[in-house]
């Protein structure tokens, strides 16, 4: 559902495939409800068992369709347009945003920029050609449901996976129970619809269970599919480069995309800025299973906002509630919205300066960093393992020499 063939890159395929899925569900309904449920179980075994099959499968399918609709209607989450940072301390701030305490950048210290949206890119934001805007916490485009999965609809995607998986598990259980009796009843053959059901159920149980397990792993580490793909690219590229060492046999396979896993963060340090290097395996956005899980279900899949400012937000009671939202369908639709909406900063309504207002808006969407990562960055600064941004290059030499022995500010 994530790693799509090249065919899925075409716009027409993205429209046709969800329709094919719906038509496929229609056939599966015929095979389950009529061929298995009525012609076999209801007529030759038990009316009650047949009714239980119909009720359970109908409930699962209603959940699948409901969460599919929620996926599409809710959308992945649109990133706000952030004007360029005031890196050069310009007096004309009409089209600029104050520089935040930290932002992710390239090796030279410049923030990432989306040329299509004409905006600073927030962490883990990616521009979607299908939506024509940048997606918050972009995960992937799912061709099977026909929409982008991002920050806002990610939890509905997990619910969709659960109930789609349950649908096929229930189908396979009933099917395996009554296949032999269908075969033994005189014809020594089975209904050909059963063969199709076995193939489809086996295939989708394998795909959906693997995908659900992978995404639960992502939630535990507050990762995205893009993060995981980049980490795997690092391993492939490292393996390829080691195989192509001059002392070894050449690797004749296709050269993988270069990915070292090295990233950079631009941080306010004393009266200047510094660039610190880290790697993808440092997981700057992971706050541990308990917080990551509750941030997904109780804080709209965000690591910022008022919810994260209070330790009481991460109580055992709320952890239990978050599991309830995960396992019980539709509870999240009626759960009190005070923990689900984006909470605005109180100062936002009292600030007269549009310039300062832009920074507050940016901070509302900027991902927080975990303490372990901040300690790691601060330790690197203490050890002078940093360099100056290129836009401050005339001052770089003086700042580097004056920073020796000084204590870095905490972020």
Curated annotation (Swiss-Prot):
GO terms for cellular component: endoplasmic reticulum; Golgi apparatus; membrane. Belongs to the DHHC palmitoyltransferase family. PFA5 subfamily. Its main location: membrane. Its EC number is 2.3.1.225. It catalyses: L-cysteinyl-[protein] + hexadecanoyl-CoA = S-hexadecanoyl-L-cysteinyl-[protein] + CoA. The active site is at 142 (s-palmitoyl cysteine intermediate). It comes from the Eukaryota. Pfam families: DHHC. The DHHC domain is required for palmitoyltransferase activity. This is Palmitoyltransferase PFA5. Residues 112-162 form the DHHC domain. InterPro entries: Palmitoyltrfase_DHHC, PFA4/ZDH16/20/ERF2-like. The chain crosses the membrane at residues 16-36, 53-73, 156-176, 194-214, 319-339. The gene is PFA5. Keywords: Acyltransferase, Lipoprotein, Membrane, Palmitate, Transferase, Transmembrane, Transmembrane helix. GO terms for molecular function: protein-cysteine S-palmitoyltransferase activity. It is found in: Membrane. It is a multi-pass membrane protein.
């Amino acid at each position: 559902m994530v790693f799509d063939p090249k065919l899925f890159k075409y716009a027409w395929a993205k429209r046709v495939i969800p329709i094919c899925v719906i038509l496929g569900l229609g056939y599966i309904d015929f095979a389950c409800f009529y061929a298995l449920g009525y012609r076999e179980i209801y007529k030759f075994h038990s009316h009650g068992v047949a009714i239980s099959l119909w009720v359970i499968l109908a409930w699962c399918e209603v959940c699948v369709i409901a969460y599919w609709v929620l996926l599409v209607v809710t959308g992945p989450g649109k990133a706000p347009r952030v004007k360029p940072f005031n890196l050069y301390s310009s007096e004309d701030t009409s089209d600029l945003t104050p520089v935040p305490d930290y932002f992710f950048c390239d090796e030279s210290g410049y923030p990432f920029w989306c040329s299509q949206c004409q905006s600073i890119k927030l962490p883990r934001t990616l521009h979607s050609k299908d939506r024509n805007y940048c997606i918050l916490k972009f995960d992937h485009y799912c061709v099977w449901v026909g929409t982008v999965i991002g920050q806002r609809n990610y939890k509905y995607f997990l619910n969709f996976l659960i109930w789609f998986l349950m649908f096929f598990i229930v189908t396979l259980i009933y099917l395996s129970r009554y296949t032999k009796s269908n075969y033994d009843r005189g014809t020594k053959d089975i209904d050909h619809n059963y063969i199709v059901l076995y193939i489809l159920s086996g295939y989708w149980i394998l795909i959906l269970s693997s995908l659900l397990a992978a995404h639960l792993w992502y939630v535990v580490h507050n990762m995205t599919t893009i993060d995981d793909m980049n980490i795997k690219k690092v391993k492939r590229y490292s393996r390829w480069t080691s195989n192509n060492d001059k002392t070894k046999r050449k690797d004749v396979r296709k050269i993988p995309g270069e990915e070292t896993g090295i990233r950079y963060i631009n941080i306010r340090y004393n009266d200047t800025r510094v660039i610190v290097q880290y790697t993808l395996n440092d997981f700057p956005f992971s706050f541990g299973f308990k917080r990551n899980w509750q941030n997904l279900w109780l804080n709209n899949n965000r690591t910022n906002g008022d919810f994260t400012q209070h330790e009481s937000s991460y109580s055992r009671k709320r952890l239990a509630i978050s599991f309830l939202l995960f396992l019980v369908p539709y509870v999240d639709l009626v759960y009190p919205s005070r923990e689900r909406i984006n909470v605005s900063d109180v100062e936002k309504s009292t600030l007269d300066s549009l310039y300062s207002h832009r920074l507050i808006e940016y901070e509302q969407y900027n991902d927080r960093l975990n303490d372990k990562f901040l300690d790691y960055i601060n330790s690197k600064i203490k050890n002078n393992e940093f360099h100056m941004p290129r836009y401050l290059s005339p001052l770089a030499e003086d700042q580097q020499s004056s920073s020796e022995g000084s204590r870095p500010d905490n972020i």
